[in-house]
């Protein structure tokens, strides 16, 4: 049995000039995940369920657990001293860590502390998403927004934690995707899936079909394609949608499938956040042999212009993402 800590140290040689900072940073995220795991499991017994009454910069009401998870992860990252600053879906602006150690830290972290938190009240899986970049401003200075507005192709590491029937941490440093299952009796994450890859063919699609009338024409055509009978391509595909990006992505990663969150009339630029959700999941997808697109472009090639930028998002088995891109090209909206 190999623990996450042992595995990270073992793989440290994958990085040129590695001196342990990234290892310590990932350990901080691991600690934050353990704390969130513990408190999610007793959320119904203490007053951390429901809405907080506070709205974020996008005007969305934040859940109590969103804010709680944000504070716990932020504290864990700050305490290790390997992070110069963070950007979070729950923070209006970047958070700059102070002190000499932070100013000399090489990395910045972007995160969605608790994806799918509206599902907590009904005991449905939720997750944490994180993304790590090497800063571009000089060491010895405070980080700026420019350190966070880098294309996803510049990510050093990315991953997620899914809190479900078991808690799993899945991550990549650009050398494959690896998954670890939490053993609460020992308090450690143990390697359970090494070098995870999408199956070559998928047969599941994940989308909120209740919004069908609002979807672009190409996406509507693709959904109909998924539902058609065709033995050669093993259609119809199965529709599976949880409403938590982490949970839907995780299932599709292991079973084969595509997750779709297109632009709609309500969200013409898409709803998911490029920096906190799309980029890290796209990095994981590509490292697992999959693909991620905004319908026209590779997600990891997009240069972000603002912290809370949104994007349409299609991610999963490569051939399925290719298909939806083809439908979007062939059936453009006027």
From Swiss-Prot:
Supply the source organism's classification: Bacteria, Pseudomonadati, Pseudomonadota, Gammaproteobacteria, Enterobacterales
Q: Which HAMAP family is this protein grouped with? A: FBPase_class1 (MF_01855)
Q: Which UniProt keywords apply?
A: Carbohydrate metabolism, Cytoplasm, Hydrolase, Magnesium, Metal-binding
Q: What is this protein called?
A: Fructose-1,6-bisphosphatase class 1
Coiled-coil regions, chain positions: none
Subunit record text: Homotetramer.
| Cofactor annotation comment | Binds 2 magnesium ions per subunit.
Q: Detail which positions bind substrate.
A: 115-118, 208, 241, 259-261, 271
Enzyme Commission number(s) of this protein:
3.1.3.11
Which enzyme type, at the first EC level? hydrolase
């Amino acid at each position: 049995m190999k623990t996450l800590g042992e595995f990270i140290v073992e793989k440290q040689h994958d990085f040129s000039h590695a001196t342990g900072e990234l290892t310590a940073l990932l350990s901080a995220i691991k600690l934050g995940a353990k704390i969130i795991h513990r408190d999610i499991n007793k959320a119904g017994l203490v007053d951390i369920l429901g809405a907080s009454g506070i709205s974020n910069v996008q005007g969305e009401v934040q859940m109590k657990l969103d804010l709680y998870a944000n504070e716990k992860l932020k504290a864990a990252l700050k305490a290790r001293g390997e992070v110069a600053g963070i950007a979070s879906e729950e923070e209006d602006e970047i958070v700059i860590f102070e002190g000499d150690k932070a100013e000399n830290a090489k990395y910045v972290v972007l995160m969605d502390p608790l994806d799918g938190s509206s599902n907590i009240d009904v005991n449905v899986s939720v997750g944490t998403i994180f993304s790590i970049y090497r800063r571009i401003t000089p060491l010895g200075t405070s980080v700026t927004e420019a350190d966070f507005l880098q294309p996803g192709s510049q990510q050093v590491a990315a991953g997620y934690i899914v809190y479900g029937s078991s808690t799993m941490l899945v991550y990549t440093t650009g050398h494959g995707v690896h998954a670890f299952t939490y053993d609460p009796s020992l308090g450690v994450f143990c390697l359970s899936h090494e070098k995870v890859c999408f199956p070559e063919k998928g047969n599941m699609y994940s989308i909120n079909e209740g919004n069908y009338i609002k979807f672009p024409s190409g996406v509507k055509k693709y959904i109909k394609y998924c539902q058609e009978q065709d033995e050669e391509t093993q259609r119809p595909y199965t529709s599976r949608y949880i409403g938590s990006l982490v949970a839907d992505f995780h299932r599709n990663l292991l079973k084969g499938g595509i997750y779709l969150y297109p632009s709609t009339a309500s969200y013409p630029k898409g709803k998911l956040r490029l920096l906190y959700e799309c980029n890290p999941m796209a990095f994981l997808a590509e490292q697992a042999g999959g693909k991620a697109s905004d319908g026209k472009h590779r997600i990891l090639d997009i240069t972000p212009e603002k912290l809370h930028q949104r994007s349409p998002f299609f991610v999963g088995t490569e051939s399925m993402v290719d298909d939806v891109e083809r439908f979007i090209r062939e059936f453009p909206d006027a």
